[in-house]
């Protein structure tokens, strides 16, 4: 029996974001020391950009073909995605043709797969970002039109139930958007905001859409209504408790 761990991510070309991703990959690799470690990136655009810099990254089918050619029989595929959604569905579809080509091919769950995960992640993030007097903590999620996007407002509810009414969750490409939670922030009387990514990596979205100098960035939009802003450019991948959650997901599918 030859066993492999295949870590699947969307990918990023931002160096700071790659540090976040590598932290999760290292944690997963350490939790399965007897497995051959491999990685795949699902974003064709990211793979193309990396290739233009002389860096090759496998797609998911390419990585699976390589493992087959090397004689691996048992493969654990662990995504670093945050939730079920279109990207996760894509992974499921791409591994389906390989299910009977390995003795065992198992797909792990995303980070926020059930209500226990939401509560655990919120607890970890509450400890990572303690409440600051007079300051709102605003988290930027990616967002999706997939029904799984309900996770974002659910997370804000979980924070509130854990006593953190200062935490607000919005998305850059989905619902709720910043402008939909801004009235809540203003009604609560906050004049200071701490922006942090609710993203695995602090990549393009965090650097530009959240903390950028452009007028449409979240930082600029908040400053335009006389709210002072500070930003943290560290993705969830750098948080030890979040790394541990991913490792627990992996353990569910190891043999």
What does each model-identified segment do?
Residues 1-255:
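Active-site-proximal alpha-helix that buttresses catalytic centers in soluble enzyme cores
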């Amino acid at each position: 029996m030859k066993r492999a761990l295949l870590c699947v991510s969307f990918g990023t070309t931002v160096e700071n974001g790659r540090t976040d991703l590598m932290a999760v990959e290292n944690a997963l690799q350490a939790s399965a020391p007897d497995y051959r470690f491999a990685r795949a990136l699902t974003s064709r655009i990211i793979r193309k950009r990396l290739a233009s810099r002389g860096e090759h990254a496998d797609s998911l089918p390419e990585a699976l073909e390589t493992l087959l050619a090397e004689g691996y029989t048992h493969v654990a595929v662990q995504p670093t995605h945050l939730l079920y959604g279109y990207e996760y569905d894509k992974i499921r579809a791409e591994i389906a043709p390989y299910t009977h080509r390995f003795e065992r091919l198992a797909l792990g769950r995303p980070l926020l797969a059930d209500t226990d995960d939401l509560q655990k992640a919120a607890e970890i993030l509450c400890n990572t970002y303690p409440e600051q007097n007079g300051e709102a903590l605003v988290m930027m999620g990616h967002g999706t039109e997939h029904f799984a996007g309900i996770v974002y407002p659910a997370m804000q509810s979980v924070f509130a139930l854990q006593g953190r009414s200062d935490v607000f969750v919005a998305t850059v490409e989905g619902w709720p958007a910043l402008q939909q939670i801004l009235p809540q922030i203003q009604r609560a009387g906050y004049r200071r905001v701490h922006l942090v990514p609710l993203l695995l990596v602090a990549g393009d979205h965090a650097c530009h859409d959240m903390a950028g100098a452009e007028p449409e960035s979240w930082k600029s939009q908040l400053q335009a209504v006389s709210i002072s802003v500070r930003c943290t450019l560290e993705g969830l991948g750098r948080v030890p408790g979040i790394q541990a959650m991913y490792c627990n997901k992996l353990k569910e599918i190891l043999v």
